[in-house]
Regions:
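Short, surface-exposed charged micro-motifs
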Residues: 45, 130, 211, 282, ...
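Hydrophobic residues embedded in beta-strands of well-ordered beta-sheets
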Residues: 54, 139, 220, 289-291, ...
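Active-site-adjacent helix-turn-beta-strand microarchitecture at beta-sheet edges
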Residues: 250-333
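Zymogen propeptides
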Residues: 169-275
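Conserved, well-ordered active-site substructure
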Residues: 256-277, 285, 326-382, 386, ...
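Active-site-proximal beta-strand/loop segments in catalytic clefts of secreted hydrolases
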Residues: 215, 246-251, 295, 354-357, ...
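Short, solvent-exposed aromatic-acidic interface loops
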Residues: 226-231, 297-301, 355-360
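Ser/Thr/Pro-rich low-complexity tracts
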Residues: 1-174
């Protein structure tokens, strides 16, 4: 005959009237109908049996905190007793109300038996949330910063944890919020030109960002510069042009060479078979109005565009605030690199962005989808990627290079790389 059943553990380690108790152990046999669970000697039928685990509904019991002995019998063969305790105040979550899955928002955890003020704590996975309002049936909390799509929310009262309810984060909104609310250092360079810089956390990584907003005007002219005779530093090209500020422009490897037009004259016709990753976008300046255009036909298509100044680059990032489907088959898009981008707002303002990278712990850089989301968060409707990596540079007259170019491997302003072209404000 089979030896007497043995109880190894009870889950949970308390008895909640009406709740389910899982009894783990051995020698339970295979017939659930033959099993009874005894609470202080009172027998109740097992509801499930799965190998070493028996499930039973806990009966209404005694007072909260009173100990109770649990045994299991199989065909009259009774186990040794295991001690548990009645808990009538176990918190239970019935739902989570409000919020859009964004950090710092208030959401209400609804349920039962949350106790009086200060008795319960709310956890999003292992992170305790700040409670702003509480009652026996509702706990209003601030959504904590966790970089995950989904977490489990539980309420703990008197050392006992409730059931878990899933909560979803909208990470795109969270990242936008982190970018918008970062501690930006802001300086007006002149009427209609504002420079902002910040160290922040976005996309679950440290970021170093510089942004310039430009309202085009008689005073604020947008131009493209191209060093046809060979590569030159952004600072040299912009300084020689008498610019107020500028960023590095297009790629300059032979097979990525962009079409460039300046003052109505073609200064570089560009490589014919440039891939769309590096050539499906163009900045087009016409009568000092800037457009960011998608050019599926790359350089060949760009040659047909009307404009005073035109520069081809890629990939195209953002159209009417919608992030482009960017190919994931190239690390150019999927890896976090230093980046330079240019975009326009619905009002025709121009946004330049540099994102530093390749400095672990200080500046991680971004993928191109992240760069597109950053440009959208900063207010761009349409945007494109410019050359990045060691080329990423923002130069401002009287200040010099203000971002942290990585070409010298040092987190300073000295690592500028010679580049083929620039976009600048005069």
């Amino acid at each position: 005959s089979m030896p007497a059943p043995v109880i190894v553990s009870l889950v949970p380690d308390y008895l909640q009237p009406g709740g389910t108790l899982m009894v783990y152990g051995k020698n339970f046999g295979s017939d659930a109908g033959a099993i009874r669970v005894l609470f202080d000697g009172r027998e109740y039928p097992a509801e499930s049996l799965s190998g070493n685990r028996v499930g039973v509904t806990v009966p209404d019991g005694g007072q909260d905190g009173r100990p109770v002995s649990v045994r299991l019998s199989r065909d009259g063969n009774v186990s040794e007793a295991v001690s548990s305790v009645w808990r009538t105040d176990v918190p239970e979550i019935t739902g989570i109300d409000g919020g859009r899955g964004v950090y710092g928002e208030l959401v209400t955890v609804a349920g039962k038996r949350f106790g009086t003020a200060g008795e319960s704590a709310v956890y999003f996975d292992e992170t305790e949330a700040e409670i702003t309002k509480e009652s026996e049936t509702a706990l209003t909390v601030k959504v904590p910063r966790i970089y995950k799509e989904d977490v489990s929310v539980t309420v703990v009262r008197g050392g006992v944890r409730s059931n878990a309810v899933s909560f979803s984060y909208d990470l795109d909104r969270c990242d936008s919020l982190l970018i918008v609310t970062a501690g930006w250092k802001t300086e007006q360079l002149r009427e209609g030109v504002v420079w902002k810089s910040a160290f922040l956390k976005a996309f679950d990584t440290p970021q170093s960002m510089n942004v310039v907003y430009v309202t085009p005007s008689q005073q604020n002219r947008l131009r493209i510069g191209c060093s046809v005779s060979g590569v030159r530093r952004t600072s040299s090209q912009c300084g020689d042009a008498g610019a107020l500020l500028g960023v590095n422009g297009g790629y300059f490897d032979e097979k990525k060479k962009p079409f460039v037009k300046i003052d109505g004259t073609v200064v570089q016709s560009g490589y014919d078979r440039v891939s769309s990753t590096f050539g499906n976008a163009a900045i087009v300046i016409r009568n000092n109005r800037v457009e960011i255009r998608k050019v599926a036909g790359c350089n060949a298509e760009a040659r047909t565009l009307e404009g005073d100044d035109i520069l081809v680059c890629g990939p195209f990032l953002l159209k009417d605030g919608v992030v482009e489907q960017l190919s994931t088959s190239t690390t150019h898009n999927t890896a976090m690199h230093p980046r330079t981008a240019v975009g326009v707002t619905g009002d025709g303002d121009v946004i330049f962005l540099t994102v530093d990278g390749r400095f672990p712990g200080k500046a991680a850089g971004m993928t191109t989808p992240q760069l597109a989301k950053a440009m959208r968060a900063l207010g761009a409707d349409d945007a494109m990627n410019l050359d990045g990596g060691g080329s990423t540079t923002l130069w401002i007259s009287g200040k010099g290079v203000v971002n942290y170019p990585c070409d010298n491997g040092a987190f300073d302003h000295g690592g500028e790389r010679p580049v083929g072209s620039v976009v600048y404000v005069k």
